[in-house]
Structures are given as structure tokens and as C-alpha cells.
A protein has these predicted regions:
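A sequence-level detector of short linear motifs
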Residues: 35, 143-144, 248
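Predominantly extracytoplasmic/ectodomain segments of secreted and cell-surface proteins
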Residues: 2-85, 95-105
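Short loop/turn segments at secondary-structure transitions that flank enzyme active sites
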Residues: 110, 120, 171-173, 204, ...
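Extracellular structured ligand-interaction cores
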Residues: 111, 126-128, 162-164, 193-195, ...
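Conserved NTP-binding catalytic cores of kinases and kinase-like/nucleotidyltransferase enzymes
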Residues: 49-51, 60-65, 72, 81-86, ...
Length: 339
């Protein structure tokens, strides 16, 4: 066992000096460097909550000259309970003449780390770096790494202390030129894509409502819509680290876009289908890759808005020619149930 008794730990400390300097540059498990919250000196290892037994493996210090020992033995605890309570296990790192205590926490969620090239926090302007995705249910080929760019997303939620992000994944061209191209990756059974959203769920303390509401829609209203696309999106819980700091629980989400809805776009087969996004009150933008946007592209939207603001009798007589009324009713009923 890698765990030592208190007497053995005292023997390891004897003759060495305690230090507050960074002694452990990285902690390795199953061949991968673990995420770390550097301010607290806490490393995180995602584990499979469907298995009662602890994962097998050894903690190793990255590089040479440092050895690590567990001062608390996880094997003495029930795994699911240790994860649920967020129990912290002390870890002793020793070199030839100094030592320092760290901690290990076992998580039941996948983990994403975002490390920017400059070390600056992800803000409104696009910034590049590296994303690493750690699976929880496997320790074989369990980490995916990609070049990434990211920026803060959202409307009023941008003012919250905990931000949501849009992440785009890239990989380097094999020509060796250093140029980047989009990198499609599938996470947690969701679609393979290069664009992903990290949803902060800041205003919802339980972190349950948004996920439950989304799952209800996906299993009801989204299935009632004819078409090749999927008129919903998936979200899975993860934990996020940014530049060596723990950022909390997030929702990893697919974006709602032309690919998700399987819409026709500019220059494709007729009729052209449009996806609009409301930016502010009365202000809409056309989503997708368009070389130009004309008044014609907004005619459908403006016709719908005219019916909404017009006479009730005209609305009742004509709205069925413009929208899928049954679908609109499904959406209304869904919103009454979840809001």
C-alpha cells in the first residue's frame, strides 16, 4: 500500500524541513498528470461511481527527486461515500531535505482543465490554450487533450462572478506549419464537434433544475418534431479547472446550431432555413456562416413579429400558416411545467 502510518510519516519528516514552496510540480496517476487547485494544494482524481471498488494504481511525483505517500488510506473508506462527502486525503511529498503536505480528492464527475498559453484568465476576447478532458469511468486512454480557444459567453449572466464559456477545439496541421484546423471530438456520448459550451449554472444552487428540465424536453417535445435534426441539446455535469484553480461544477453542452437542427444554409437546397438569436429586446441576429445578410433573410421573422403585435383575429386566422402550432403548444406546456 502507498499509505503510511503516522509513525512512518514522522520518520519521513525527520531530518527534513517543512516548506511552503511548490515541491510537487505534478501528480501522476494511470499515466496522466492530475488536475490541481494550486492555491489549496489539492489534486483531483475522477473515479467511476458505478464501481464499488477503488481504482487501482499508484500516485507518482512528476519528474525526479520527489516521492509521495498517502497519510490517509482511501481503502479504509467506502468509495461512494468518500466521493459524496468530498473527503480530502492527505498526501506527503518529500525530497532529499524538505517536505510538504498536499491533498487528494476523488470526484465522481469527469474533469476539464483549461490552461491558457499566457496564464491569463479567459475573458471576452478569444484566448488560446490547452484543454484536457479526464474521463471518470475509465483509466485507459482516459484523457483527451486539444488545442483550444475560449471566451466568455452569455447575456446578463456575463455579470455573474462565475462565467460561462464557449470553447473551440483545434489541432495542428500535419504539415508542421503550425497552422491550426478544427478538431471534432465527442465527449460523454454527445455529438462529435469542435465547438462546446461550458454552462456555469451560477443562479441555480442545486445544479439540478437546468439538467432535469433539459432532459424532460429531450424525452418529450424534442422527439415530436419531424426532421433529421435533433431539436434539443444534451448537457452533462463536469468539474472545471482554469489555470491551476478549481472553478466548480459546470454543464458541458452541445451548442444549438445549424448542425444540431440539420438546417439548410446559404447556397444549399431550397428552401433556405434560418436560425435567429435574440441579442437584446427587439434585436435579433442570424446564426450560422453567411457571406452577407439581407432584409430578405429576416422576412420570416418580421412576419411572425407583425402577427404577434397585430390584431388578435388576424393572428388566430393566419399564424397557422407561419408556425407549427402543435409544436408551439408543446413548448408552452413544457415551460409551464419547468419554470
Amino acid at each position: 500500500s502507498q499509505a503510511v502510518t503516522e509513525q512512518e510519516a514522522e520518520a519521513l519528516r525527520e531530518g527534513r524541513t517543512a516548506t511552503e514552496e511548490e515541491l510537487l510540480q505534478g501528480l501522476i496517476f494511470a499515466g496522466e498528470e492530475l488536475p490541481c487547485d494550486r492555491p489549496s494544494g489539492t489534486f483531483y482524481l475522477p473515479v467511476d461511481m458505478d464501481e464499488e471498488d477503488w481504482e487501482t494504481g499508484t500516485f507518482l511525483a512528476e519528474g525526479g527527486g520527489v516521492k509521495v505517500y498517502l497519510l490517509d488510506n482511501p481503502m479504509e473508506d467506502e468509495k461512494q461515500e468518500a466521493v459524496r462527502t468530498g473527503k480530502s486525503y492527505r498526501l506527503l511529498a518529500v525530497s532529499e531535505d524538505v517536505y510538504r503536505e498536499y491533498a487528494v480528492v476523488f470526484s465522481g464527475l469527469p474533469i476539464v482543465t483549461l490552461d491558457t498559453d499566457t496564464g491569463a484568465e479567459i475573458r471576452y476576447d478569444e484566448i488560446y490554450g490547452t484543454l484536457r478532458f479526464y474521463e471518470a469511468d475509465s483509466k485507459k486512454d482516459w484523457v483527451t487533450e486539444s488545442v483550444m480557444s475560449g471566451h466568455i459567453r452569455g447575456g446578463s449572466s456575463r455579470l455573474n462572478p462565475k462565467k460561462s464559456y464557449k470553447i473551440t477545439l483545434y489541432k495542428k496541421n500535419q504539415t508542421g506549419s503550425g497552422a491550426l484546423r478544427k478538431n471534432d471530438v465527442s465527449f460523454l456520448g454527445m455529438r462529435s464537434d469542435n465547438e462546446w459550451l461550458l454552462y456555469a449554472m451560477y443562479s441555480e444552487d442545486t445544479k439540478v433544475r437546468d439538467k432535469l428540465s433539459l432532459d424532460i424536453w429531450n424525452e418529450s417535445g424534442a422527439l415530436e418534431i419531424d426532421g433529421e435534426g435533433f431539436y434539443g441539446y444534451h448537457m452533462e455535469y463536469i468539474e472545471v479547472f482554469q489555470n491551476g484553480e478549481y472553478w466548480g461544477i459546470y454543464g458541458l453542452m452541445e451548442p444549438v446550431d445549424y448542425k444540431q437542427l440539420d438546417l439548410t444554409g446559404e447556397g444549399e437546397a431550397q428552401p433556405v432555413e434560418y436560425l435567429y438569436k435574440q441579442k437584446d429586446a427587439g434585436v435579433f441576429e442570424l446564426k450560422g456562416s453567411w457571406t452577407e445578410q439581407t432584409e430578405e433573410d429576416f422576412e420570416i421573422l418580421e412576419a411572425y413579429r407583425a402577427y404577434l403585435e397585430g390584431d388578435d383575429s388576424d393572428f388566430k386566422a393566419e399564424i397557422g400558416n407561419l408556425i407549427d402550432v402543435d409544436n408551439a403548444l408543446d413548448v408552452w406546456l413544457y415551460l409551464q411545467a419547468v419554470i
